[in-house]
């Protein structure tokens, strides 16, 4: 919660996106805007608060006394490293003692499975994991970080059982409120890449998350 209260997200996103506004989007949603059936509108969630005093108070209430906070990242994905560097600066401004551990991606993936080896790590979630709320890693008790909060898991179980779209959306709205109250994961926003395709390539679907070459051909 202190981390969530402390950070000023826009300069972080802007820096990571190379200063290009078309390559980032500020959004508190756990689902992306490209999936409107799950994109909620809940004003007042504690996201991008930029509230240093609140962050300091939360650290004090938690009994934090400057112990090293192990934050894993990697330079193999430059955007992750940039996220970590600027976040580190902002967190240290409110009293965190950040031990930034820069490792290769394979080591990060291995170490993140052992909660004794770190306190937080950088990562990103692709749109393929967002098509339904029951697929979201960030609210899963089985994914590194282990969002095992009882209320979050109760809502996820209800989402898995419910078939009425309106009731499922209401549950997903409720999940956002609980998620931001518990703050198991810190949501920054959305990043976008740039993809170039020759005019001779036909049948390629630009809207999917990762490259697929099924039914793609060259027309020369």
Q: Which functions belong to the PLM regions below?
A:
Residues 1-35, 83, 178-187:
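Periplasmic-binding protein-like
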Residues 2, 6, 15, 58, ...:
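Generic, well-ordered alpha-helical scaffold segments in large soluble proteins
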Residues 33-53, 111-117, 134-163, 191-220:
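Short, solvent-exposed loop/beta-turn-alpha elements that line the ligand-binding surface or hinge
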Residues 1-14, 152-169:
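Extended ligand-binding regions for polar small-molecule ligands
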Residues 14, 61-79, 120-124, 163-199:
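Bilobed periplasmic-binding protein-like "clamshell/Venus-flytrap" ligand-binding domains
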Residues 22-61, 77-80:
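Structural transition elements
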